[in-house]
A protein has these predicted regions:
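Short, locally clustered residues in the helix-turn-helix/winged-helix DNA-binding domain
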Residues: 20, 52-59, 121, 148
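Charged, amphipathic alpha-helical coiled-coil/dimerization segments
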Residues: 85-141
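Amphipathic alpha-helical dimerization/coiled-coil segments
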Residues: 25-29, 33-36, 123-156
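A short acidic, leucine-rich amphipathic alpha-helix
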Residues: 68-71
């Protein structure tokens, strides 16, 4: 295994560990230890992920739909439809008629969904801040830059 292969292997292992550390169960345990259980348990099923997908669409200026949620989450449309329905039933999102195409429903976050999104972002940032406790500002900046670049490269591969 060459020098570069060892680095790629280290990244792959770190990605697996990161994915495990971001599971609903792990985050719920962490939230409970930080007395933030409402953040981890407030959304049904993958409700937080649905809110993330809708928020991403809102920020990009492209209306969110079940199809865009499915693409963002990497799941099929029937599964996305069920997750969206659960988020709507929980009062976190709502469907609105597309004024340009009445057959299409657009998804938007409700005020409750926006509040939950803000809470989740704050919680995730606290977790990241805690994980980087003791890091220098330079290390934090370098990590943020490299991780962002890595994620952008991964995204470009799937488009």
């Amino acid at each position: 295994m060459g020098h570069d292969d060892a680095h790629v292997e280290a990244v792959e292992r770190a990605m697996v560990a990161l994915r495990r550390s971001q599971s609903r169960r792990t985050l719920a345990r962490l939230a409970a230890t930080r007395r933030r259980a409402t953040v981890a348990a407030a959304a049904p099923g993958a409700g937080v992920e649905v809110l993330d997908a809708i928020e991403e669409a809102e920020e990009s200026g492209v209306p969110a739909t079940v199809t865009s949620v499915a693409a963002a989450l990497g799941i099929d449309q029937p599964r996305a439809s069920k997750l969206v329905a659960a988020a709507v039933a929980a009062g976190l999102a709502r469907r609105e008629a597309d004024q340009a195409d009445g057959r299409r429903a657009l998804l938007v976050r409700t005020p409750a969904g926006r509040r939950l999104s803000a809470e989740v972002h704050a919680f995730r940032r606290q977790v990241a801040d805690r994980a980087m406790a003791g890091w220098s500002d330079r290390d934090r900046a370098q990590f943020a830059r490299l991780l962002t670049r890595f994620v952008e490269s991964l995204g470009a591969m799937t488009r």
